[in-house]
A protein has these predicted regions:
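Amphipathic alpha-helical packing segments from all-alpha helical-bundle domains
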Residues: 72-75, 122-147, 156-160, 187
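Amphipathic C-terminal alpha-helical segment
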Residues: 102-105, 152-153, 159-179, 190-199
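N-terminal intrinsically disordered/low-complexity leader segments
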Residues: 1-15, 22, 79, 197-199
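Amphipathic alpha-helical segments used for helix-helix packing
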Residues: 103-123, 171
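Helix-turn-helix
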Residues: 2, 19, 23-61
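Short, structured motif recognition centered on aromatic/hydrophobic residues
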Residues: 28, 74-75, 92-96, 112-114, ...
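Generic hydrophobic, amphipathic alpha-helix propensity
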Residues: 16-24, 41, 66-70, 74, ...
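Hydrophobic alpha-helical connector segments
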Residues: 65, 80-105
Length: 199
Protein backbone atom coordinates (compact mmCIF):
# COMPACT_ATOMS: atom_id res chain seq x y z
CA UNK A 1 0.00 0.00 0.00
CA UNK A 2 1.34 3.46 -0.89
CA UNK A 3 1.92 6.17 1.69
CA UNK A 4 -1.01 8.19 0.31
CA UNK A 5 -3.31 5.19 0.45
CA UNK A 6 -2.26 4.43 4.01
CA UNK A 7 -3.03 8.00 4.98
CA UNK A 8 -6.59 7.54 3.72
CA UNK A 9 -7.28 4.18 5.32
CA UNK A 10 -10.75 4.32 6.89
CA UNK A 11 -10.67 5.01 10.60
CA UNK A 12 -13.38 4.06 13.05
CA UNK A 13 -16.64 5.61 11.87
CA UNK A 14 -15.27 6.45 8.42
CA UNK A 15 -16.72 4.52 5.49
CA UNK A 16 -15.06 3.62 2.21
CA UNK A 17 -17.48 6.03 0.56
CA UNK A 18 -16.27 8.87 2.79
CA UNK A 19 -12.66 8.04 1.97
CA UNK A 20 -13.43 8.06 -1.75
CA UNK A 21 -15.13 11.45 -1.43
CA UNK A 22 -12.15 12.91 0.41
CA UNK A 23 -9.43 11.65 -1.89
CA UNK A 24 -11.46 12.50 -5.00
CA UNK A 25 -12.02 16.05 -3.72
CA UNK A 26 -8.29 16.53 -3.25
CA UNK A 27 -7.52 15.10 -6.68
CA UNK A 28 -10.23 17.05 -8.51
CA UNK A 29 -8.99 20.27 -6.91
CA UNK A 30 -5.36 19.56 -7.73
CA UNK A 31 -5.67 18.08 -11.23
CA UNK A 32 -9.23 18.78 -12.43
CA UNK A 33 -11.67 16.15 -13.65
CA UNK A 34 -9.95 15.47 -16.96
CA UNK A 35 -6.62 14.83 -15.27
CA UNK A 36 -7.96 12.35 -12.72
CA UNK A 37 -8.56 8.68 -13.47
CA UNK A 38 -10.53 6.08 -11.56
CA UNK A 39 -7.28 4.23 -10.92
CA UNK A 40 -5.74 7.36 -9.37
CA UNK A 41 -8.72 7.75 -7.05
CA UNK A 42 -8.79 4.10 -6.02
CA UNK A 43 -5.03 3.96 -5.46
CA UNK A 44 -5.18 7.03 -3.23
CA UNK A 45 -8.14 5.51 -1.36
CA UNK A 46 -6.39 2.16 -0.96
CA UNK A 47 -9.03 0.11 -2.77
CA UNK A 48 -9.16 -1.89 -5.99
CA UNK A 49 -10.43 -0.20 -9.15
CA UNK A 50 -13.83 -1.94 -9.23
CA UNK A 51 -14.36 -0.94 -5.60
CA UNK A 52 -15.38 2.57 -6.62
CA UNK A 53 -18.43 1.22 -8.42
CA UNK A 54 -19.76 -0.26 -5.20
CA UNK A 55 -20.42 3.31 -4.06
CA UNK A 56 -20.75 5.45 -7.21
CA UNK A 57 -22.05 4.77 -10.70
CA UNK A 58 -18.97 6.32 -12.32
CA UNK A 59 -16.36 9.06 -11.97
CA UNK A 60 -18.87 11.75 -12.91
CA UNK A 61 -21.27 10.63 -10.18
CA UNK A 62 -18.37 10.84 -7.74
CA UNK A 63 -17.60 14.41 -8.82
CA UNK A 64 -21.23 15.41 -8.32
CA UNK A 65 -21.22 13.89 -4.83
CA UNK A 66 -17.90 15.57 -4.00
CA UNK A 67 -19.49 18.94 -4.67
CA UNK A 68 -23.06 18.38 -3.52
CA UNK A 69 -22.56 16.56 -0.23
CA UNK A 70 -20.55 19.25 1.61
CA UNK A 71 -22.54 22.04 -0.03
CA UNK A 72 -25.80 20.56 1.23
CA UNK A 73 -24.30 20.29 4.72
CA UNK A 74 -23.19 23.94 4.64
CA UNK A 75 -26.60 25.11 3.47
CA UNK A 76 -28.45 23.05 6.07
CA UNK A 77 -26.21 24.34 8.86
CA UNK A 78 -26.66 27.95 7.72
CA UNK A 79 -30.43 27.59 7.51
CA UNK A 80 -30.70 25.97 10.93
CA UNK A 81 -28.40 28.57 12.48
CA UNK A 82 -30.40 31.45 11.02
CA UNK A 83 -33.61 29.93 12.36
CA UNK A 84 -32.26 29.10 15.82
CA UNK A 85 -30.09 32.14 16.62
CA UNK A 86 -32.05 35.40 17.04
CA UNK A 87 -28.98 37.64 17.29
CA UNK A 88 -27.63 38.31 13.77
CA UNK A 89 -24.09 39.06 14.93
CA UNK A 90 -23.88 35.77 16.81
CA UNK A 91 -25.42 33.90 13.90
CA UNK A 92 -22.84 35.39 11.54
CA UNK A 93 -19.97 34.47 13.84
CA UNK A 94 -21.25 30.88 13.96
CA UNK A 95 -21.52 30.70 10.17
CA UNK A 96 -18.04 32.13 9.64
CA UNK A 97 -16.52 29.69 12.11
CA UNK A 98 -18.27 26.70 10.56
CA UNK A 99 -17.34 27.71 7.02
CA UNK A 100 -13.66 28.13 7.90
CA UNK A 101 -13.54 24.79 9.70
CA UNK A 102 -15.18 23.17 6.68
CA UNK A 103 -12.57 24.64 4.34
CA UNK A 104 -9.72 23.54 6.60
CA UNK A 105 -11.13 20.05 6.98
CA UNK A 106 -11.66 19.36 3.27
CA UNK A 107 -11.05 20.82 -0.16
CA UNK A 108 -13.47 23.77 -0.58
CA UNK A 109 -16.56 22.93 -2.59
CA UNK A 110 -16.64 26.21 -4.49
CA UNK A 111 -13.09 25.85 -5.80
CA UNK A 112 -13.69 22.24 -6.83
CA UNK A 113 -16.87 23.25 -8.65
CA UNK A 114 -15.22 26.15 -10.47
CA UNK A 115 -12.31 24.00 -11.60
CA UNK A 116 -14.50 21.11 -12.77
CA UNK A 117 -17.71 22.81 -13.86
CA UNK A 118 -16.93 22.11 -17.52
CA UNK A 119 -17.23 18.36 -16.87
CA UNK A 120 -20.72 18.52 -15.37
CA UNK A 121 -23.95 18.13 -17.35
CA UNK A 122 -26.05 21.28 -17.53
CA UNK A 123 -28.73 19.94 -15.17
CA UNK A 124 -26.11 19.21 -12.51
CA UNK A 125 -24.46 22.62 -12.95
CA UNK A 126 -27.78 24.38 -12.51
CA UNK A 127 -28.74 22.36 -9.44
CA UNK A 128 -25.37 22.94 -7.77
CA UNK A 129 -25.38 26.66 -8.57
CA UNK A 130 -28.87 26.94 -7.11
CA UNK A 131 -27.69 25.28 -3.89
CA UNK A 132 -24.69 27.62 -3.75
CA UNK A 133 -26.97 30.61 -4.21
CA UNK A 134 -29.32 29.42 -1.47
CA UNK A 135 -26.37 29.03 0.89
CA UNK A 136 -25.16 32.53 0.05
CA UNK A 137 -28.67 33.92 0.62
CA UNK A 138 -28.57 32.76 4.24
CA UNK A 139 -25.45 34.86 4.78
CA UNK A 140 -26.76 37.80 2.77
CA UNK A 141 -29.95 37.94 4.85
CA UNK A 142 -27.92 38.20 8.04
CA UNK A 143 -25.36 40.66 6.70
CA UNK A 144 -28.18 42.88 5.40
CA UNK A 145 -29.46 43.30 8.94
CA UNK A 146 -26.00 44.14 10.26
CA UNK A 147 -25.15 46.52 7.41
CA UNK A 148 -28.13 48.85 6.85
CA UNK A 149 -25.65 51.33 5.36
CA UNK A 150 -25.20 49.11 2.32
CA UNK A 151 -27.51 48.51 -0.63
CA UNK A 152 -28.52 44.95 -1.49
CA UNK A 153 -26.04 44.72 -4.40
CA UNK A 154 -23.28 45.96 -2.08
CA UNK A 155 -24.15 43.34 0.52
CA UNK A 156 -24.04 40.63 -2.12
CA UNK A 157 -20.69 41.80 -3.44
CA UNK A 158 -19.25 42.01 0.06
CA UNK A 159 -20.54 38.58 1.07
CA UNK A 160 -19.21 36.84 -2.03
CA UNK A 161 -15.86 38.60 -1.64
CA UNK A 162 -15.57 37.26 1.89
CA UNK A 163 -16.47 33.78 0.62
CA UNK A 164 -13.57 34.01 -1.82
CA UNK A 165 -11.24 35.05 0.97
CA UNK A 166 -12.29 32.20 3.25
CA UNK A 167 -12.13 29.59 0.48
CA UNK A 168 -8.59 30.67 -0.38
CA UNK A 169 -7.36 29.25 2.93
CA UNK A 170 -7.22 25.81 1.33
CA UNK A 171 -4.65 26.92 -1.24
CA UNK A 172 -2.82 29.75 0.56
CA UNK A 173 -2.24 28.24 4.00
CA UNK A 174 1.49 28.34 4.69
CA UNK A 175 1.68 25.93 7.58
CA UNK A 176 -0.25 27.76 10.29
CA UNK A 177 -1.99 25.59 12.85
CA UNK A 178 -5.77 25.33 12.65
CA UNK A 179 -6.48 27.54 15.66
CA UNK A 180 -4.37 30.35 14.22
CA UNK A 181 -6.08 30.07 10.85
CA UNK A 182 -9.55 30.11 12.40
CA UNK A 183 -8.76 33.11 14.61
CA UNK A 184 -7.11 35.14 11.85
CA UNK A 185 -9.71 34.45 9.18
CA UNK A 186 -12.69 34.80 11.52
CA UNK A 187 -11.48 38.20 12.70
CA UNK A 188 -10.93 39.38 9.13
CA UNK A 189 -14.28 38.07 7.88
CA UNK A 190 -16.36 39.48 10.74
CA UNK A 191 -14.65 42.86 10.47
CA UNK A 192 -15.20 42.98 6.71
CA UNK A 193 -18.86 42.01 6.99
CA UNK A 194 -19.86 44.19 9.94
CA UNK A 195 -17.69 47.33 9.93
CA UNK A 196 -19.61 50.39 8.71
CA UNK A 197 -18.41 52.02 5.51
CA UNK A 198 -15.55 54.43 6.08
CA UNK A 199 -14.00 52.55 8.99
Amino acid sequence: MTTDAAAHEPSAGTSRRDVLLKVAADLFLRNSYDGVTVDMICTAAGISGPGLYNHFENKLALLVAVVESPLAALHQFARETAEAEPDPRTALEILVDFHIRSVIGAAPTTLIFMKNEHALPEKDRRRIRREMNLYAEEWISIVSILRPDLSEPEVRLLTHTVFSMLNSVATLNKGLDHDSIIKTMSTAAIKALTSPSGE
